[in-house]
Swiss-Prot record:
It is found in: Mitochondrion outer membrane. The modification Phosphoserine is found at residue 376. It comes from Saccharomyces cerevisiae (strain YJM789). Interacts with CAF4, DNM1 and FIS1, components of the mitochondrial fission machinery. Interacts via its N-terminal, coiled-coil extension (NTE) with FIS1, and via its WD repeats with DNM1. The lineage of its organism: Eukaryota, Fungi, Dikarya, Ascomycota, Saccharomycotina. The keyword Coiled coil applies. This is Mitochondrial division protein 1. Residues 240-298 form a coiled coil. Residues 323-354 are annotated as: Disordered. Residues 332-343 have a biased composition (Polar residues).
């Protein structure tokens, strides 16, 4: 084979291989079959092997996997070359031939590149047809496959721009056109990546082909010059079309990758959800075991472990049953005897006997052994985008929700509705009803959950405060649903009733050891949770506290007040010996519970305060004057305030200097005072106003006027 034949043969091999890989992108063939299924490539491979006389020729030229030089230099090892020009240098070639081999492919070879449809370029090698061709040639021209050379050439402007930006980066970095220092390699690499990412953006610059001038086009009288401009522009259009198709292909690849990542994320989210469901199940089982142990201890039903043999086990089981039956009989006798004995006592003595039993139960309930600590807390809500609706519970009550509270994300939710005397308990993970608390005689205004003891405190318009055992309430409700026990159960989920207020309870705050309540009777009372006693009473019947910003006659009873009436004490919160109250006159007062005196007043609201929350640094208040104000507790000064188009009905502390706000609108507003911006959680198409809200650990629950409850990630 002559030198020219070798050159031609190598050129055809390169062209055929490149075309095969380009066509592979538009076919569904397997990657391993790209070359083996290509006819022209197989023919060239066969000719190469035949011209080599025998495959053993290649093995003879190798030693330990590398080609060995010989005196004739007829076969070269490309791995042993230090310069690219030495690869094809031998006794048959010179420097010019090597340069041609490395840099030039003739138009004839480009025109012979096979395509998927078996089409070839025009004989003159033009990229686009011009005037004079028939319509079929025009259609075929648009269907031609892009060659590897055309793809390289179309990206030359982008490559030049990349080189220019890299040189500019190096110059801007160290003031010269040299290379970047080794210590700055990582940072400079990141900067280069950002520049390369922005390379395809041609919004600010339009590339005009060299040799084409717009002024000459409008003033030229030379047909040859105009035809030359036309050909250049046609070629440029073809190059731009190649770039566009390649970019579209990259976009499609990115979309596929994004979809794959989205599906992978959904699978991982489902996995985390299952894990947290299992954690909640195990937590519930642990709680049931603890409750069962307490039950056995309370009724004296503990049985010594039996021996390992069957007889001993049977004896133990029979003994357990006997003890249980005796305990039940004794309990029945005791209950009957107490009832008969109490019936013979005077009314005041009967009430005292009931109070003593209730106090004993309260003290036993708040013993240290009753305190529960969760082993794990849900974090699934943190994986949602802020403002994402997680779920909803429809029609929890017939009228608007007056208050709600929950213990933890995806945990237990308690709700109360207007003119509804019961509290309903819901499972936030399954979004179904799991319990009910009946005992109040009027609408329930406020509530708070203590998740350490599994309790709920409620305050209603019947002037009563009630402490509930949520775990027992759920067990009784489940037994009632399954009809596994009589309906006249001895136990009651109401652990204790705090009775001292003479008018409706409008606000409360639950501390680890104390309960603080505010009422329409213009008093604030502090209660001991272990004894049930009222430790102190703070009277708010002093000047200008309850006389402004209202037209309501306070001399009348408010047990049947209207829903829009301003409460005397709209909100309060306590922590240790600190107490903050918001009253009808729009003034926030900070109290020291040890002395029962006001230590600071915060004035700024012009109407009754409806809600407040504080932490170690700031205090957030909402009012009927349609504003939310954030106060600095250290200085007592107003930091920021934000105005709304409707009265603020409820709020909760989102984070420092930020709050979740309900302003009698269909959306919940999240106000960030540091950034001085507000964004909302709104459900499209739902025009029902929000009446109350609670937030904990990136998890928000809001109640609406139609009784619906929505759950959000924020």
């Amino acid at each position: 084979m002559s030198v020219n034949d070798q050159i031609t043969h190598i050129g055809k091999t390169l062209s055929t291989t490149a075309s095969a890989f380009l066509n592979y992108q538009k076919s569904n063939s397997n990657t391993q079959d790209v070359l083996t299924n290509n006819g022209p490539y197989k023919n060239l491979l066969s000719n190469t092997v035949n011209n080599a006389s025998s495959t053993s020729y290649f093995y003879k030229r190798t030693e330990h996997g590398r080609f060995v030089k010989n005196a004739s230099n007829t076969f070269e090892d490309i791995y042993s070359k230090t310069r690219r020009g030495d690869v094809f240098r031998n006794k048959f070639t010179d420097n010019k031939t090597c340069f041609r081999m490395l840099t030039y492919i003739s138009d004839d070879l480009l025109n012979e590149i096979p395509t998927k449809e078996g089409l070839k370029s025009d004989a003159d090698g033009k990229l686009l047809t011009e005037g004079g061709e028939n319509e079929n040639l025009r259609k075929n021209a648009s269907k031609k496959e892009t060659s590897l050379f055309q793809g390289f050439k179309s990206y030359l402007p982008i490559a030049e721009l990349a080189i220019e930006n890299t040189e500019r980066l190096n110059y801007d970095t160290n003031g010269t056109s040299g290379t970047v220092g080794a210590k700055d390699v990582m940072s400079k690499t990141n900067e280069r990546d950002e520049i390369h990412t922005e390379l395809p953006n041609f919004q600010d610059s339009f590339l005009i082909p060299p040799g084409v001038e717009t002024k000459k086009i409008s003033s030229s009288y030379s047909p040859s010059a105009l035809k030359s401009f036309s050909q250049t522009l046609v070629n440029s259009l073809e190059f731009l079309n190649i770039q566009k198709n390649s970019t579209l292909s990259e976009i499609r690849d990115i979309e596929v990758e994004v979809e794959n990542l989205r599906q992978k994320k959904e699978k991982l989210l489902g996995k985390i959800a299952n894990i947290e469901q299992n954690q909640l199940l195990l937590e519930d089982n642990l709680k049931q075991i603890d409750d069962r142990l307490d039950f056995l201890e309370e009724y004296g039903l503990e049985v010594i472990e039996a021996n390992s043999d069957e007889n001993a086990e049977d004896d133990g089981m029979s003994e357990r049953k006997a003890l249980k039956n005796d305990a039940i009989r004794n309990e029945g006798v005791t209950t009957e005897s107490i009832s008969s004995e109490a019936s013979n006592l005077p009314p005041r003595r009967r009430q005292q006997l009931r109070d003593d039993n209730s106090l004993n139960r309260l003290g036993a309930f708040y013993s240290k052994s009753k305190k529960r600590h969760r082993k794990s807390f849900p974090t699934f809500q943190q994986l949602y985008e802020p403002g994402t609706k997680i779920g909803s519970i429809m029609s929890t009550h017939d009228d608007f929700l007056t208050c709600l509270d929950f213990d933890a994300p995806f945990g237990t939710l308690c709700t109360a509705g207007y003119l509804d005397h019961t509290v309903k308990i819901w499972d936030l993970s399954k979004q179904n009803k799991i319990g009910e608390l009946a005992g109040h005689l009027a609408t329930i205004n406020c509530m708070q959950i203590n998740r350490d003891y599994g309790t709920l405190v409620t305050g209603g318009r019947d002037a009563a405060l009630k402490l509930w055992n949520l775990n027992l309430a759920q067990q009784l409700y489940q037994e009632t649903q399954n009809l596994t026990s009589p309906t006249n159960h001895i136990d009651s989920p109401c652990v204790y009733t705090f009775e001292a207020h003479t008018d409706e309870v409008t606000a409360l705050s639950l501390d680890p050891s104390f309960l603080v309540s505010g009422s329409q009777d213009r008093t604030i009372r502090q209660w001991d949770l272990r004894s049930g006693k009222c430790l102190q009473t703070i009277d708010l019947s002093f000047a200008n506290v309850l006389t402004t910003s209202t037209n309501v006659d306070l001399s009348k009873s408010t047990l049947l007040t209207q829903r829009n009436e301003r409460p005397s004490i709209g909100a309060l919160q306590s922590f240790d010996a600190a107490l903050a109250t918001g009253t009808k006159d729009g003034v926030v007062r900070l109290w020291d519970l040890r002395s029962g005196k006001v230590i600071r007043t915060l004035k700024g609201h012009t109407d009754a305060i409806t809600s407040l929350k504080f932490d170690s640094a700031c205090l957030v208040t909402g009012s009927y004057d349609r504003t939310v104000r954030i106060w600095d507790l250290r200085t007592g000064l107003l930091n920021k305030f934000h105005a709304y188009s409707a009265p603020v009905l409820s709020l909760d502390l989102f984070q420092e200097n930020a709050a979740v706000v309900v302003a009698d609108e269909p959306s919940v507003q999240i106000y960030d005072s540091e950034k001085d911006e507000s964004w909302s959680c709104v459900e499209q198409g739902n025009e029902t106003s929000v009446s109350t809200v609670k937030y904990k650990e990136n998890y928000m629950v809001e109640g609406r006027e139609n009784g619906d409850v929505n759950i959000w990630a924020v």
